[in-house]
Amino acid sequence: MKLHEYQARDILARYGIPVTGGGVATTPAEARTIAEQIGGRVVVKAQVFVGGRGKAGGVKLADTPEQAEQVASQILGMNIKGLTVEKVLVAEAITYEREIYLGAIMDRASRRIVMMASAEGGVEIEEVARTNPEAIVKVAAHPMMGLLDFQARDLAYGIGLTDGRQARQFAQIATALYRAYMDVDASLAEINPLVVRADGSLQALDSKIVLDDSGLFRHPDLEAMRDSSDEPEAEQRAREAGITYIKLDGNIGCMVNGAGLAMATMDVVKLYGGEPANFLDIGGGAGKEKVKTALQIILSDPNVKAVMFNIFGGITRVDEVAKGIIAALEEVNTDVPMIARLVGTNEEEGRRILAESALIPAATLAEAAEKAVQAAQSR
């Protein structure tokens, strides 16, 4: 789950990371009020989940509250890469001498939280990694003790912050960012840029936090911050139904119960020369309504040329899955071929229910994948 910049900066501020003064506005009048409270030059920034806001005209400076109101009226309602701007962040505009990148991310190779810093701040870190990887300094936090003081200092020295006061403040900010990352169950937390001001102090100008959806049950306050404006309708509907769905680029829709089985199913589809259109896990104990919703989500993708069901009934009853498939087909008019491999609890009843339908039966996963690939290729 992505957070807007203003939401991320509020979290950073709670951990003692210095951020610029300001607030979020939904109307030009609110933007003017915030600018009056700041009492100086401000920057008005569109709050949308896309990059390149500045180039699209979504970030503008204002010297007076009146200008802030005018600029906000121009940005609010603007369409940036398909997203409508509904909120703007009005923040203090400051001068600075240097931009730094600082971020925390899970590194699956080392199975550690890795803190990254770069002297090349203000640009996408992926671009720095591609063009000048030597400019990125990394340290892996200890899995039990977290980010240690000497590691935070190593980051500072690694990007050229040799002044003792600056290095100490940077280390404090890095440690605070790590704590925030861990406490909110984030998958990414970054400050870009973290700037060095004329007096040598550091301040966070822009920030980004992405939360791990699997940890949101521990954070109802953060879940309440969700903005689904950039979330595809199918994924939003799946989330609300308790279905794990990720759209892919292939043409074979897959409905499976269990994440491991779903990944194995996709592998076998690839083995037989096909391309999965999605990852979809209906979970354990799915009833017919959930199955119906899942099938409707799969069929909402116009690229789907065949649908493959791979259900292993343990907690999930095969007959309930079969009822859900039939119920969905009664509501969705489609000629997409469907292949079903259903085994486990009440499988005989499930097969009986499907026997009168147009579904193509399969006894094994390999057979189901092969038939699905053939069906998709024939269309």
Curated annotation (Swiss-Prot):
State whether it acts alone or in a complex, and with which partners, per the record. Answer: Heterotetramer of two alpha and two beta subunits.
Its UniProt pathway annotation is: Carbohydrate metabolism; tricarboxylic acid cycle; succinate from succinyl-CoA (ligase route): step 1/1
Xref: Gene3D superfamilies: ATP-grasp fold, A domain, ATP-grasp fold, B domain, Succinyl-CoA synthetase domains
Spell out the molecular function terms from Gene Ontology. Answer: ATP binding; magnesium ion binding; succinate-CoA ligase (ADP-forming) activity; succinate-CoA ligase (GDP-forming) activity
* Task of the protein: Succinyl-CoA synthetase functions in the citric acid cycle (TCA), coupling the hydrolysis of succinyl-CoA to the synthesis of either ATP or GTP and thus represents the only step of substrate-level phosphorylation in the TCA. The beta subunit provides nucleotide specificity of the enzyme and binds the substrate succinate, while the binding sites for coenzyme A and phosphate are found in the alpha subunit.
Q: Which GO terms describe its biological process?
A: succinyl-CoA metabolic process; tricarboxylic acid cycle
- Superkingdom field: Bacteria
Q: Which organism is it from?
A: Roseiflexus sp. (strain RS-1)
Q: Does the keyword Ligase apply?
A: yes
The entry sums up its family as follows: Belongs to the succinate/malate CoA ligase beta subunit family.
Tell me the protein's name.
Succinate--CoA ligase [ADP-forming] subunit beta
Classification of source organism: Bacteria, Bacillati, Chloroflexota, Chloroflexia, Chloroflexales
Task: Give Gene Ontology CC terms.
Answer: cytosol; succinate-CoA ligase complex
